[in-house]
């Protein structure tokens, strides 16, 4: 990579395992980025374990950290990456910081994973307070350049339901009009052309031509479903999409193929290791299902393409 590319990543931190900043920093560093991490929480482990302990950063503490960077004139970034946030005032402070950074650097790219909820058995539910939704809709998404919602989050943000691929792209057009040039719906319950064993993801990238007109590239990807429930995959996805869109800014197809293929390598390695540790016929524990990130370094750096994207 030519020159230094620096990312401010505001996400959660765990002592053990890989979620939030722990899932984002390693792949970004492997791919050549400098990463400055603000830990929105510091927990012993993710909350899928039986027990966890830790601390939560307040909006005032976030402001103090940023003011420290500013006082030393080192608040200069090429990218901002944000993920799970539970607190409205904290999210508001993130908005203020990103606005200021964008005023300093008009080329700064803000990558936002608008973590709000998901669908289980066809029913969607939010796992953050509902008062975060208007903040995402009115302030966060209009500032973002790249967003990575799942289907339920895309529906929440747009106020529209998705029952087909056509409706999904109509929702993505609504999201484009709100602000972001790149929208990737990371998972959906839409039927895949490859059958019920596959999960469908969709991407849309709006590009401006020199004459001022816009052209939109749309893609579809099908990934084989995996059995265990992993934690941190969304954080890993957003970080790698940041990296690969930086390296392929006008080719969402290639950026998504590299991102999703690297994800598949990490997940398959994690499944193999977890099953071996758990033993024959035993269900792996949350600790055994932690993403095998370090062991997947070469796959993250140069992924063999195992998932092809279809340009639509």
Curated annotation (Swiss-Prot):
NCBIfam families: pyridox_kin (TIGR00687). Activity is increased in the presence of K(+)or Na(+). Catalyzes the phosphorylation of the dietary vitamin B6 vitamers pyridoxal (PL), pyridoxine (PN) and pyridoxamine (PM) to form pyridoxal 5'-phosphate (PLP), pyridoxine 5'-phosphate (PNP) and pyridoxamine 5'-phosphate (PMP), respectively. PLP is the active form of vitamin B6, and acts as a cofactor for over 140 different enzymatic reactions. One of its GO terms (biological process) is pyridoxal 5'-phosphate salvage. Pyridoxal 5'-phosphate binds at residues 47, 234-235. Pathway: Cofactor metabolism; pyridoxal 5'-phosphate salvage; pyridoxal 5'-phosphate from pyridoxal: step 1/1; Cofactor metabolism; pyridoxal 5'-phosphate salvage; pyridoxine 5'-phosphate from pyridoxine: step 1/1; Cofactor metabolism; pyridoxal 5'-phosphate salvage; pyridoxamine 5'-phosphate from pyridoxamine: step 1/1. It comes from Rattus norvegicus (Rat). Keywords: Acetylation, ATP-binding, Cytoplasm, Kinase, Magnesium, Metal-binding, Nucleotide-binding, Phosphoprotein, Sodium, Transferase, Zinc. It is found in: Cytoplasm, Cytosol. The gene is Pdxk. Pfam families: Phos_pyr_kin. The keyword Kinase applies. The modification Phosphoserine is found at residues 59, 164, 213, 285. Its main location: cytoplasm. Its EC number is 2.7.1.35. This is Pyridoxal kinase. Homodimer. Its cofactor is Zn(2+); Mg(2+). The active site is at residue 235. Na(+) binds at residues 113, 148, 186.
């Amino acid at each position: 990579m030519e020159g230094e590319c620096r990312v401010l990543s505001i996400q959660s931190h765990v002592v053990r395992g890989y979620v939030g900043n722990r899932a984002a920093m390693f792949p970004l560093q492997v791919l050549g980025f400098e990463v400055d991490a603000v830990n929105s929480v510091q927990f012993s482990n993710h909350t899928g374990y039986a027990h966890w302990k830790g601390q939560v950063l307040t909006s005032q503490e976030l402001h103090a950290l940023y003011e420290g960077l500013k006082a030393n004139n080192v608040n200069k970034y090429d990218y901002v990456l944000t993920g799970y946030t539970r607190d409205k005032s904290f999210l508001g402070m993130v908005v203020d910081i990103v606005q200021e950074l964008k005023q300093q650097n008009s080329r700064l790219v803000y990558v936002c994973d608008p973590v709000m909820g998901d669908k289980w058995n066809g029913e969607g539910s939010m796992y953050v307070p509902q008062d975060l939704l208007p903040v995402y809709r009115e302030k966060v998404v209009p500032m973002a350049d790249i967003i990575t919602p799942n289907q339920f989050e895309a529906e929440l943000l747009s106020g529209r339901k998705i029952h087909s691929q056509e409706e999904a792209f109509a929702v993505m057009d609504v999201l484009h009009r709100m602000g972001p040039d790149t929208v990737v719906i990371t998972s959906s319950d839409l039927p895949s052309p490859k059958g019920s064993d596959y999960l469908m993801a969709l991407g849309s990238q709006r590009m401006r031509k020199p004459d001022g007109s816009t052209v939109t590239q749309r893609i579809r990807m099908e990934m084989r479903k995996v059995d265990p429930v992993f934690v941190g995959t969304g954080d890993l996805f957003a970080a790698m999409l940041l990296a690969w869109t930086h390296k392929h800014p006008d080719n969402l197809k290639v950026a998504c193929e590299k991102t999703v293929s690297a994800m598949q390598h990490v997940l398959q390695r994690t499944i193999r290791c977890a099953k071996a540790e758990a033993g024959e016929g035993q269900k792996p524990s949350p600790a055994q299902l932690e993403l095998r990130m370090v062991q997947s370094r070469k796959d993250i750096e140069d992924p063999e393409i195992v998932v092809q994207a279809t340009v639509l």
